[in-house]
Amino acid sequence: MTGDDELAIFSTCPQSRDSTPEQYARRVAETARWSEAAGCEGILVYTDNGILDPWLVSQLIIESTERLAPLVALQAAYMHPYSAAKMVTSLAYLHGRRLYLNMVAGGFRNDLLALGDETPHDARYERTVEYAHIMTRLLAGETVSYQGERYTVSNLSMTPALPAHLQPGMFISGSSPAGLDAASRIGAVAVKYPKRAGEETDQAGERSGMRVGIVARASEQEAWSAARERFPEDRKGRIAHELAMKVSDSHWHRQLSDMATATSEQDDPYWLLPFENYATFCPYLVGSHERVAAELARYVELGFHSFILDIPASEEELHHVGVVFERARASVP
């Protein structure tokens, strides 16, 4: 499983709320090493009001690996674009490593309201475009003067300079029209939460990625047994999901929640139970290596080339993921 010009595979870092302080640093380092050994290009590091700072977690990831690139979630409400650019160039200067940035407009309004931020959904994407515009120009070595609706800078430059080969790759979370428009304007990979492959549309040459979890085994029975063991039915989780829906204005969150899930598990690898139980925020593909690989190949044929996986349960899980991506890659012309 490698990140190359055709497919780029990212895992996801554990969240600090799921561990004690004593356990967390060990889990981050361990997951990062698993991901690197599995051939992942990078690893997503979340951000929100209830977890550790993603930049500090990213430094731990860099120190624990040789080449794995943190995909740092970047929320405009938390940090000025100059500060974000300074973080990127500082880590590059200290470690000689490239980062990826996942621009997050913010889907949970309560987090934003707690910060005094009442910016509406679409306007948050406009803010993200301005933010990325300033940040990327600084990282490119320009002296930036800019006056927009939300940010104003004058003759601003970045020191130390960022080498060209360490310029960050950029993603943006969002599948709404505003999110897709923002992705196009800033040249970012649009990260979507996919529908079933048979219901997805051709990406028509767009730079598209997806968030998806995978549980694959040699047989369908083994895969579903492992999936149900990891994600059992959870009434409290369903209640938490329903409460979260009431305070979210996220397009993808509502889209997934509205999807029908009556299809029999054994007949359909696309599985939303973990999402419905508030155990994760993406759909899962579950089944035999062959079945999941075939489903992934359908997404690749539609134009999806970047895949951000869920938090790996174990090193073995990443091995199975590697098997399905190799088979999917081999089956696509």
Predicted region positions:
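Hydrophobic faces of well-ordered beta-strands that scaffold small-molecule active sites
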Residues: 5-13, 43-45, 69-74, 99-103, ...
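N-terminal beta1-alpha1-beta2 module of alpha/beta enzyme domains
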Residues: 1-67, 147, 167-168
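An alpha-helical appendage that flanks or caps ligand/catalytic pockets
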Residues: 1-3, 115, 121-162, 197-300
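Conserved, mostly hydrophobic/aromatic
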Residues: 35, 61, 91, 101, ...
